Amino acid sequence: MPGTPSLYAAIDLGSNSFHMLVVREVAGSIQTLTRVKRKVRLAAGLGADNALSADAMERGWQCLRLFAERLQDIPPSQIRVVATATLRLATNADVFVARAQEILGCPVQVIAGEEEARLIYQGVAHTTGGADRRLVVDIGGASTELVTGTGARATSLFSLPMGCVTFLERFFTDRSLTQEHFASAEQAARDILQPVIAQLRGQGWKICVGASGTVQALQEIMMAQGMDERITLAKLQQLKARAIHCGRLEELEIEGLTLERALVFPSGLAILIAIFSELEIECMTLAGGALREGLVYGMLHLAVDQDIRNRTLKNIQRRFMVDIAQAGRVAQLAERFAVSVEREWALDDLSRALLHSASLLHEVGLAVDFKRAPQHAAYLVNNLDLPGFTPAQKKLLATLLLNQTGTVDLPALQQQNAVPLRVAERLCRLLRLAIIFASRRRDDMLPDVTLTAHDDTLTASLPQDWLSVHPLGAEMLEQEQLWQSYVHWQLDVK
């Protein structure tokens, strides 16, 4: 049976989990159709002689039988299957790989550590915003990849022999979570890091992103607990203290930590603490993609877009038939307003960039219906895949769109954690006013309005007689003053 030409599949035979990603290309990006993940814990089957046990191999083959059914619909030339650290180490890897290829009907490539690091970096570069120099950290089941680079180009690639499964079996064998066990795991990780620290520091970076299950788990924990999404050493130490307090792995309970991730969380946490300490990392955020995305984008031969957020915004505007000219007017006004109050209101570049993004998407809900358009817009943004935006940033965008007009939902603004609450409130106010002043949908009808701020009092100064000449606009502003006053936001119009 012929395959579907537009489909691509990437399979990652990892040391902890096997993953399958099936996508199709849409407008220079990828649309995910299927994600399948199974905890195989292949690394746990490595014996002292580095031979894989029969049980571990059978767990892997059983998982691949599930994957094989889906691969029947995809041309073999559009499938890539790679195996990583455990199968690099296993003395009987050829036995596992030969049977795996029979099951899948396509080649399985055991890739070197540096190639794994390169693919991880490509996946990050294609899916994670920012043009600055970056450090990418991926803690796998049996290896940890550390990569520095700028844009599409990796400048240093390292694959180190430490992972959350191998460290679990080595340092938490009895499943007790003690200070001593953590200390031993952290010291071992520091020792492994020593030969590469100088070169990594020499490359330097401005942003650090994590692309592993450990970092995903941390993100889920922080979101569940209402913290901001920035991972810091202080937060890692707090989580370690919580784990030690729980005492045993089977009793590990941390709000936001799923049962599926709990088993290898302490060992991954110990490795990450060592990385933060040795490389003096200030903060880390979650990457948008990693190895599997790197494989897919490699098959598609797509160039890395230096402005991933802009590509994402344009794709959404096109998909939902947004009036691009009107979105641009609102974005232009919102930026003008932000510039006029940025010093008084301490709006940084990221906050202004997120305001710009919200402005460009504010009418996306009209594609569903005019009624409840802000709610539709918020739902869409919350649930769409937005490469270049972190989960917390997506939530902020959705919250701003929800509050673009009408009664202000203050609890929704309080629940986002991408920016401080006061900043979120201020971005909301600027967006609402930009939408009002651009409501005539014509460039020549944009008023020469000036915004000034003093603490939380916002003053809109309009040309003489503007209010009398534009009675509908005056009424909209009067209503907006009321809505803002309900949440104790002072808006003066003169």
Swiss-Prot record:
Pathway info: Purine metabolism; ppGpp biosynthesis; ppGpp from GTP: step 2/2
EC number(s) recorded for this UniProt protein: 3.6.1.40
InterPro entries named in the record: ATPase_NBD (IPR043129), GppA/Ppx_hydrolase (IPR050273), Guo-5TP_3DP_PyrP (IPR023709), Ppx_GppA_C (IPR048950), Ppx_GppA_N (IPR003695), PyroPPase_GppA_Ppx (IPR030673)
Keywords: Hydrolase
Gene3D superfamilies assigned to the protein according to its UniProt record, in alphabetical order: 3.30.420.40, Exopolyphosphatase. Domain 2, Hypothetical protein af1432
NCBIfam families noted in UniProt: PRK11031.1
Protein name: Guanosine-5'-triphosphate,3'-diphosphate pyrophosphatase
Phylogenetic classification of the source organism: Bacteria, Pseudomonadati, Pseudomonadota, Gammaproteobacteria, Enterobacterales
